[in-house]
Amino acid sequence: MLQMPSKQPISAGIVIVAAGRGERAGSPTEGPKQYRPIGGKPVIVHTLENFMTWEPATAIVVVIHPDDEALFAKAFRHIISATPIETVHGGPTRQRSVLAGLRYLKDKHVSHVLIHDAVRPFFDHTLLDRIAENLANGALAVLPAMPVTDTLKRADGAGTVLTTVSREQLFAAQTPQSFAFETILDAHEKAAASGRSDFTDDASIAEWLGIPVTIVEGTGDNVKLTVKKDIAMADDKLSASLLPDVRTGNGYDVHQLEAGDGVTLCGVFIPHDQKLKGHSDADVALHALTDALLATCGAGDIGDHFPPSDPQWKGAASRIFIEHAARIVRERGGTIMNADVSLIAEAPKVGPHREAMRANLSEYLGIDLERCSVKATTNETIGFVGRREGIAAIATATVVYRGRT
């Protein structure tokens, strides 16, 4: 609990309004905007994390749409919080959703409440402390707001300008809008009982009942993510500020040699008096590199995706496996930066085919040739490799995952 320089401390309940559908934020198949990723995490997680680390917050309730329970549960996996976080279902309007959250907090023994839009993730503790100081000093309602700086025009229904509106004493309201708890709960209950459902924010309900609302300075970053472009800009902003998430994966594979007419390594067929034994084409190099790529995002290994017991992969080209792994990496936000393969074999000689192998890796992975390396060494006639009983491969992949913490 944060003791302000005032006569009373603040014990704050937090209501996060997250029941909206976000029709203006793109295709419905993309999901509600509060669950879209920015900087590697859902919008709502960024919002919650700001409140979770604010000392006066003693209870947090997130008001969600009934259809979004699975989405919230998935987002909640990102969260470790000492402050209790609960959910309730919202109503058909923002006003009804807020009331549901307030009713939930009735037995949580909070003195004040901050009501915040889930899709405003860019507030900070300085703003919260400014609000709390005013509440602690006796304000019944506190509204963060910014002076209007754009020129405002009033137009008729046809889009013709009627007049220029003075900006003096005009403010753009933000959230969290904050109140003495019993005051705003009573105001919301009275609004519901009166049949009024047209209030667009909580300060308006306080104004309707004559409750004085104190304005404190908001922040320019505390914007509401409304349309698809807002979400893209927010993602760029956060991703640019994060340290790069560089991951390295390793892979190892070995295949036996048997009598045959050649081996396939990195997709290149090399004539030889032996061949590699395996369920697919036994390209030991690509198998090792496939595992290395999958390792960078914890996606298992090649056997999980292409089990040797599955007859459809009998004799399959290993290009299928490596391109599958590269696709998984990209779907999870990764950019492949480097691929390195070391082959351990007594024969055949790899040197004459190295550039063709590198070219294949470049094509399969969709990266520049200079980012692909193929090396070879013998085992100095030691062990199964030295006895020409098999070929081994060690691979390393470096992947940068964008927008992860």
From Swiss-Prot:
One of its GO terms (biological process) is terpenoid biosynthetic process. Its cofactor is a divalent metal cation. Residues 247-405 are annotated as: 2-C-methyl-D-erythritol 2,4-cyclodiphosphate synthase. It comes from Rhizobium etli (strain CIAT 652). Pfam families: IspD, YgbB. Keywords: Isoprene biosynthesis, Lyase, Metal-binding, Multifunctional enzyme, Nucleotidyltransferase, Transferase. It catalyses: 2-C-methyl-D-erythritol 4-phosphate + CTP + H(+) = 4-CDP-2-C-methyl-D-erythritol + diphosphate; 4-CDP-2-C-methyl-D-erythritol 2-phosphate = 2-C-methyl-D-erythritol 2,4-cyclic diphosphate + CMP. This is Bifunctional enzyme IspD/IspF. The keyword Cell membrane does not apply. Pathway: Isoprenoid biosynthesis; isopentenyl diphosphate biosynthesis via DXP pathway; isopentenyl diphosphate from 1-deoxy-D-xylulose 5-phosphate: step 2/6; Isoprenoid biosynthesis; isopentenyl diphosphate biosynthesis via DXP pathway; isopentenyl diphosphate from 1-deoxy-D-xylulose 5-phosphate: step 4/6. The record marks R24, K33, H279, T378 as: Transition state stabilizer. The keyword Zinc does not apply. 4-CDP-2-C-methyl-D-erythritol 2-phosphate binds at D253, V254, H255, H279, S280, D301, I302, G303, T377, T378, N379, E380, F384, R387. CDD domains: CDP-ME_synthetase, MECDP_synthase. Bifunctional enzyme that catalyzes the formation of 4-diphosphocytidyl-2-C-methyl-D-erythritol from CTP and 2-C-methyl-D-erythritol 4-phosphate (MEP) (IspD), and catalyzes the conversion of 4-diphosphocytidyl-2-C-methyl-D-erythritol 2-phosphate (CDP-ME2P) to 2-C-methyl-D-erythritol 2,4-cyclodiphosphate (ME-CPP) with a corresponding release of cytidine 5-monophosphate (CMP) (IspF). In the N-terminal section; belongs to the IspD/TarI cytidylyltransferase family. IspD subfamily. In the C-terminal section; belongs to the IspF family. Its EC number is 2.7.7.60, 4.6.1.12. Gene3D superfamilies: 2-C-methyl-D-erythritol 2,4-cyclodiphosphate synthase, Spore Coat Polysaccharide Biosynthesis Protein SpsA, Chain A. GO terms for molecular function: 2-C-methyl-D-erythritol 2,4-cyclodiphosphate synthase activity; 2-C-methyl-D-erythritol 4-phosphate cytidylyltransferase activity; metal ion binding. The record marks R167, K224 as: Positions MEP for the nucleophilic attack. A divalent metal cation binds at D253, H255, H287. Residues 1-246 are annotated as: 2-C-methyl-D-erythritol 4-phosphate cytidylyltransferase.
